[in-house]
């Protein structure tokens, strides 16, 4: 079977690795154009491109798949199937129709819940009990196609956006290989999604990471986990932006953002409802540290009565 793979970040690269180890022929890889990255803003290849180049697979990086030249280029590859994972470009219907068996997508949620760009983080933020990967047939709508198979994992009270991402990146690739086998032998037909159950996972926005201490502590604790490792929740203290990487629910009352107490166990801050104990912080110019380490060296910065967010 001739497969074209389309994907961009590390999550997608894990899927490409599994396909390279499968019996199927990867005839080409599509990925986003190289982007400036790092302090020097050098053009850097995507994780998928780096892997493809290492395996001598032809790489295509069109700005769009909406023009006739790009579509003709894809058609010339004569793909039986296109596997799409976190690619980042919209595939118009004419592209979806090119492969003999169509296009399939590995999506990091239990569809139809959390269609869209940031399903992993939104599941943690919402306090969902479980997440997973759905392999589906692609159609013109956003993550709306018939579902071929699902794999499920519980979301623990300690999971972050990062830990859930890594777990799903391990679960998704074998599911895709299994789905391809089911398509090839005709055993997988697909289950229509119930649009009434659909929710949308909006793209992450850095502005969302600024902590609003008037919100309930339970919501903020989930947000802090969801936005770790990116974009990372933060709040102002003494005119500096302090990153908050971990927190636990606590008790206490005060003005939202007010420091209620500080000890080696954590920095207790009042919220709109209850309080949070901040247990891992990063000060400007420094590295992430447990609050017990910060408390030893910067005790005066975290005096009770100070207010975060100002």
Curated annotation (Swiss-Prot):
It comes from the Bacteria. InterPro entries: Fmt, Formyl_trans_C, Formyl_trans_C_sf, Formyl_transf_N, Formyl_transf_N_sf, Formyl_transferase-like_C_sf, GART_AS, Met-tRNA-FMT_C. PROSITE patterns: GART (PS00373). GO terms for cellular component: cytosol. SUPFAM superfamilies: FMT C-terminal domain-like, Formyltransferase. One of its GO terms (molecular function) is methionyl-tRNA formyltransferase activity. Its EC number is 2.1.2.9. Keywords: Protein biosynthesis, Transferase. (6S)-5,6,7,8-tetrahydrofolate binds at residues 109-112. It is an enzyme of class 2 (transferase). It catalyses: L-methionyl-tRNA(fMet) + (6R)-10-formyltetrahydrofolate = N-formyl-L-methionyl-tRNA(fMet) + (6S)-5,6,7,8-tetrahydrofolate + H(+). Disulfide bonds: none annotated. Attaches a formyl group to the free amino group of methionyl-tRNA(fMet). The formyl group appears to play a dual role in the initiator identity of N-formylmethionyl-tRNA by promoting its recognition by IF2 and preventing the misappropriation of this tRNA by the elongation apparatus. Belongs to the Fmt family. This is Methionyl-tRNA formyltransferase.
